Design a protein with these regions (language model features):
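Glycan-recognition and catalytic cores of secretory/periplasmic carbohydrate-active enzymes
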Residues: 1-106
């Protein structure tokens, strides 16, 4: 099986450009609609913030220097607003007022 490395890199960069819009201004990463617009009326979800932090860390390792800032943004949310500092673990989702559910990841 063969693949076109040029196409693969271009497609990866296209997907990363789409994902860059997911930065949530309150911390973490937002859900994106089909057009790539962040859905800021939805809470910041732990799984999305974890995934996007990982995606941008890989992008940074691939030489996309701009992605380092987004890794820092994600790690700050994971260590900050998504973390339950009183009992440990992470909240499944948070909005501007805090956790939207008592569901947590230990």
């Amino acid at each position: 099986m063969t693949f076109d490395a040029t196409w693969l890199e271009a497609e990866g960069d296209r997907l990363l450009a789409f994902a860059r819009a997911s930065v949530h201004p309150d911390g973490g990463f937002a859900w994106l609609d089909e057009e790539g617009s962040p859905q800021l009326d939805r809470p910041a979800e732990l799984w999305i913030s974890c995934r996007m932090t990982h995606v941008f860390a890989l992008a940074h390792l691939m030489g996309r220097r701009w992605a380092g800032e987004l890794v820092d943004h994600g790690v700050a949310a994971l260590a900050g607003r998504l973390r339950d500092h009183e009992h440990g673990g992470w909240w499944a989702a948070v909005d501007a007022d805090g956790p939207v559910t008592r569901a947590k990841t230990p």
